[in-house]
Every structure is written in C-alpha cells, then in structure tokens.
C-alpha cells in the first residue's frame, strides 16, 4: 500500500487507552508513514492520535448504569460514523467498548472500510448471539486469551490470538523482597493485599466486605499480619478512609496511592475483586481469593444470562476451579477469611498453574496485533 496509511482507532476507557497506545507504537515501528484519527485518552494522543472528543465521554459501566448516558452515547456514535465516513480511513480498529464500537464497525465495513475489533467482548460467557453481529461487523477479531480465539474459530469468525500485553510487561519472576523494601514493609510479617475495585460503585459494595474479612482473618491467623490496599485515585482513597474510620483502630492496614503492582509483588496472598486485576495477580504468581458483588438489579438479570461455570479470569484460563471465587450472597466476610487462611500456608498449586498461564500469554501482543492489522490493510 503506497502513501500514508490512515488508521482510525476508538477506545472507551483507560485500559483501552493503554492497549491502543502500545498498538500505535508497534504500528509506527513498521510503518512510520501512518496517521491516526479517532477517540482515545492521553496515552493514545501522546502517540499521535487526533481525538475527535474526550475519551471519558464514553466511559460508562453496568447494564442499567448506562441508561442515563444513552442519549449522549448514541449521538456521539452518530457523529463519529459521519466523520469517519467523510475521512475514509484505510482501517478502523475498535478497542474493547463493544456496545459502542460494533455498531460503528458494521456501518464502516458496509461502506468498504476494513474493520478490526481488539479485545473480545465476553460473548463466550453471555449474550452469545452477539457473535452474529461480530461476524457481520469485523474483518478480524484480535483476542487476548486463547479460549476466546477457539470460540470464534468454531463459529467461523476471522480471529487471531495475540496474547496479553500485561503478560509481556510483567516479568516471569518478581522480587518480593525488593517490593517490600520499596513499600517500607517489615520483614517477618505476612502481607495480604486487598483490591476491592477501582470504581466508586464496586468499592462501595466490596470495600466494607473486604475490611470485615480482614478483621476476621486477623483473628484467625497466628503471627504478625498486615494488609496493603492500593487506591486507584484520590477519590477512592477518601472513600476507603471513610470506611476504615468505622472499623477497629488497630487494624494493621496501609493505604497506597496507586502502586498496585508493587502491592501484588510484595504480598503473600490477595483478596481481590473480579476483573482485570485478577490477571495482574496471576501474573505476579500470588495466591488469591476472588469475590464480587453486583448491583442487585444487575445481578438479577446477569445470573440468567451468563453461560460459563466460572466468573474469574484465572479459572477461565485454567479451565477449572483453580482459585476460590465467591459471588454475591456467597461473598461473606467469614467465607472470604476462611478461603484465605490455607493460601497463607500453601498456595503452591495456584502459583504453579499461574506460571504456565503467564508463559502461554507472553507473546509480544502489541507486535502481533500490529502485524495482523497491517496484513489486513495490505489486502484492502
């Protein structure tokens, strides 16, 4: 393909901004004559993206939480389709945000523009009929996990498993002692990391639960014990400080500003909200208990739609019940503490499997994704 390659990318939240920026770097390494348009955050803009509007306008979560923003989202998507049809990029890459991106991909593909979707929606878990729209909308699906690629291959959707960028970034072996020294943690203490979520709503549901579980674990565990809690933002720190003000004053807990990777590297075990953070804990080879509580109405709907036996990424990747996972009413302080106790003594079965999974995901994901994108562009 001669001349400047124009690529449109749209990301809807911070994780997509990170993936998009890394992909843009890999594309520029092969094709310096490339131009980026679309929607992205500060990282993608730093790589040269001309963003049509702030990415934060697309960041919304939950089945019912989205309803209040739906008119704006639909309007912005309509504007974006209009602008992209006028700009005629050589290729469109929708990064995650499937409910927003797939509609754009469908319109652009019908207009003769090649389309890629990067990061599979959880179509293998629920709303499986979405695969029909994906087949119509996408020239290529790029997946982070191997079981996703198997799902699409069985349904005749063009797909490439590229691996996960986090598996490339996090080393196969990490230095626990160095991480503890960096956090000024005392030698000889057992360290448990608490990661109750980065969003306000999930922290409101899980924060008090995790704190009460920590209190119960303190009573059950023999020997010195300390908890570390990374705070995703100043707002989340204030939220946690308010929760801790209502608990016992001698609870040995340290709040961190960010530094979640250091907390994972330093700890002996993790109590963690379901989500991407469970993959990070897996890559750091730390035994974990996974918990989650949804908004009641969301859970009432979701429990009838989900088709998989597990909800946590480690179990989905292992294909078995490798880590304890407790959802909704099963996630009680007593149950969480009791599930953590044995992991403080012997968590080896989990961590051996974690190492094998890490190696399977470590594939230089951004380079592979860039190669796949450029192969598709050359066919255009």
Swiss-Prot record:
RNA-binding as UniProt keyword: no
Principal EC category: transferase
InterPro entries (UniProt xref): Glyco_trans_19 (IPR003835)
GO biological process terms held by the UniProt record: lipid A biosynthetic process
Entry EC no(s): 2.4.1.182
Keywords in alphabetical order: Glycosyltransferase, Lipid A biosynthesis, Lipid biosynthesis, Lipid metabolism, Transferase
Domain of life (superkingdom): Bacteria
GO cellular component: membrane
Coiled-coil regions, chain positions: none
Catalytic activity: a lipid X + a UDP-2-N,3-O-bis[(3R)-3-hydroxyacyl]-alpha-D-glucosamine = a lipid A disaccharide + UDP + H(+)
Entry GO MF terms: lipid-A-disaccharide synthase activity; phospholipid binding
Pathway: Bacterial outer membrane biogenesis; LPS lipid A biosynthesis
Cited function: Condensation of UDP-2,3-diacylglucosamine and 2,3-diacylglucosamine-1-phosphate to form lipid A disaccharide, a precursor of lipid A, a phosphorylated glycolipid that anchors the lipopolysaccharide to the outer membrane of the cell.
Family label: Belongs to the LpxB family.
NCBIfam families from the UniProt entry: lpxB
Protein name: Lipid-A-disaccharide synthase
Organism encoding this protein: Azotobacter vinelandii (strain DJ / ATCC BAA-1303)
Gene (UniProt): lpxB
